[in-house]
From Swiss-Prot:
InterPro entries for this protein: Endo_dU (IPR002802)
Name the record gives this protein: UPF0215 protein MA_4269
Superkingdom per UniProt: Archaea
Family: Belongs to the UPF0215 family.
Organism: Methanosarcina acetivorans (strain ATCC 35395 / DSM 2834 / JCM 12185 / C2A)
Pfam families in alphabetical order: DUF99
Length: 196
């Protein structure tokens, strides 16, 4: 059931992004923000490149964090991490009790994704997890009108849109995701690069 609820300006949001695919283990970084203005902490873990452990690793990282009790929302930069290690957002919501908002800069090319998944013996399972993430909604967060796309679990569309807009203060990407990306790439490459 997706709920809409009152959103405080300093709602605690955890944004998660992954690093570059350089090894079999891929670093994931989470940043804890109060709204879009204030970073309270950084979380780190590792997932398997092209594995199936992203949901479990992210859930464990969240539940073992000292920030867990204050967190109200988890934001993901897409549903695939470390190549095609797919996050089951419904399961992540059930495991953590925290609503999940997936943010994407571009609408996914499902044809290309399906083609890539044909190279995996369990490609059909991964495809089902991707489909299970639900309807993709278009959202404009900034004045220039550049849209982003979101999916959600455990939260109503109005609340999800409000939280994304509240936390998108520097660009059309929410600060928790933008900063997680900067940290993840900076640690791996010695300097941040690319866009969240």
């Amino acid at each position: 059931m997706d709920l809409d609820f009152h959103i405080k300006p300093e709602i605690r949001v955890l944004g998660i992004d992954d690093s570059a695919l350089l090894n079999e283990k891929v670093m994931i970084v989470g940043t804890v923000f109060r709204g879009g203005d204030w970073m309270d902490g950084v979380l780190r873990s590792e997932i398997t490149r092209d594995g199936l452990d992203a949901t479990e690793v992210i859930s464990t990282m969240i539940k073992n964090s000292r920030h867990y009790a204050q967190l109200r929302i988890v934001m993901l930069d897409g549903v695939t991490y470390g190549g095609f290690n797919v996050v089951d957002i419904e399961e992540l919501y059930r495991e953590t009790g925290l609503p999940v908002i997936v943010v994407m800069r571009a609408y996914p090319d499902f044809e290309k994704i399906r083609a890539a998944l044909r190279h995996f013996s369990d490609g059909e399972l991964r495809w089902e997890i991707i489909k299970k993430a639900g309807k993709i909604e278009k959202l404009v967060t900034e004045k220039n009108g550049t849209p982003i796309y979101i999916q959600k679990a455990g939260i109503g569309l109005k609340s999800a849109e409000k939280i994304v807009r509240l936390t998108s203060i520097r660009s059309n990407i929410p600060e928790p995701l933008r900063v997680a990306h900067l940290i993840a790439t900076g640690i791996i490459f010695g300097e941040s690069r690319g866009r969240a």
